């Protein structure tokens, strides 16, 4: 299985694993959503709809803020997984954040995040996690490519929806299209950081 391992310098006691699944079947997505709502511990992951995520920096910013809030007891959500989703949202409404950034049965792509204590990170734990995710998400049509900025911008993000969510339809961008992803990243992160101010 392909995944990104993120270590936060300020929080050496935790390790973040990020997986991308594409082509996940609608019944599987429906099952994931139902299990999350029921609180099934086998689904103790952060599942994200990547249509509103513009870059890895945008995703990392949300993860960092969620871990920071968790470590200092300032979480607005009940769980760290929901806090990651909430920190992607530009507005102060957890239910709206779950609706926009959580599992969407209409989107066959899914970013899956697991935050683990570094002390529990070893090859056996990664293999168990790998096997578990394959069991709950794999279908004949699903794939597990490496998550990077190119695949996010070219294949996953829906720019029209992203601009609507972050209210960027009237934003002026430089004429150089090569840095559009960078400009949108800065605006999206800024909107999240200023939420509620």
UniProtKB/Swiss-Prot annotation:
GO cellular component, one term: chromosome, telomeric region
Keyword match Kinase: no
Entry keyword annotation includes Hydrolase: no
Paired cysteines (S-S): none
Lineage top rank: taxon: Eukaryota
Biological process terms in GO annotation: tRNA threonylcarbamoyladenosine modification
Keywords: Activator, Chromosome, Nucleus, Telomere, Transcription, Transcription regulation, tRNA processing
Protein's cellular compartments: Nucleus; Chromosome, Telomere
SUPFAM superfamilies linked to this entry: PF0523-like (SSF143870)
Main function: Component of the EKC/KEOPS complex that is required for the formation of a threonylcarbamoyl group on adenosine at position 37 (t(6)A37) in tRNAs that read codons beginning with adenine. The complex is probably involved in the transfer of the threonylcarbamoyl moiety of threonylcarbamoyl-AMP (TC-AMP) to the N6 group of A37. CGI121 acts as an allosteric effector that regulates the t(6)A activity of the complex. The EKC/KEOPS complex also promotes both telomere uncapping and telomere elongation. The complex is required for efficient recruitment of transcriptional coactivators.
Family: Belongs to the CGI121/TPRKB family.
Subunit field text: Component of the EKC/KEOPS complex composed of at least BUD32, CGI121, GON7, KAE1 and PCC1; the whole complex dimerizes.
Protein name as it appears in the record: EKC/KEOPS complex subunit CGI121
Organism: Debaryomyces hansenii (strain ATCC 36239 / CBS 767 / BCRC 21394 / JCM 1990 / NBRC 0083 / IGC 2968) (Yeast)
Lineage: Eukaryota, Fungi, Dikarya, Ascomycota, Saccharomycotina
């Amino acid at each position: 299985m392909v995944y990104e391992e993120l270590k936060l310098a300020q929080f050496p006691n935790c390790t973040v694993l990020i997986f991308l699944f594409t082509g996940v079947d609608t019944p599987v997505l429906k099952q994931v959503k139902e299990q999350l709502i029921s609180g099934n511990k086998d689904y103790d992951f952060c599942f994200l709809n990547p249509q509103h995520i513009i870059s890895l920096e945008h995703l990392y910013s949300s993860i960092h803020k969620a871990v920071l809030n968790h470590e200092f007891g300032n979480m607005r959500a009940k769980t760290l997984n929901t806090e990651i989703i909430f920190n992607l949202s530009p507005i102060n409404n957890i239910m709206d954040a779950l609706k926009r950034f959580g599992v969407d049965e209409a989107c066959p792509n899914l970013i899956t995040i697991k935050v683990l204590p570094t002390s529990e990170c070893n090859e056996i734990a990664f293999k168990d996690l790998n096997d578990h995710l394959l069991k709950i998400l794999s279908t004949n049509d699903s794939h597990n490519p490496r998550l990077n900025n190119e695949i996010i911008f070219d294949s996953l993000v829906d720019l029209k929806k992203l601009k609507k969510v972050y209210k960027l339809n009237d934003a002026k961008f430089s004429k150089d299209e090569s840095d559009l992803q960078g400009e949108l990243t800065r605006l999206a992160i800024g909107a999240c950081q200023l939420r509620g101010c």
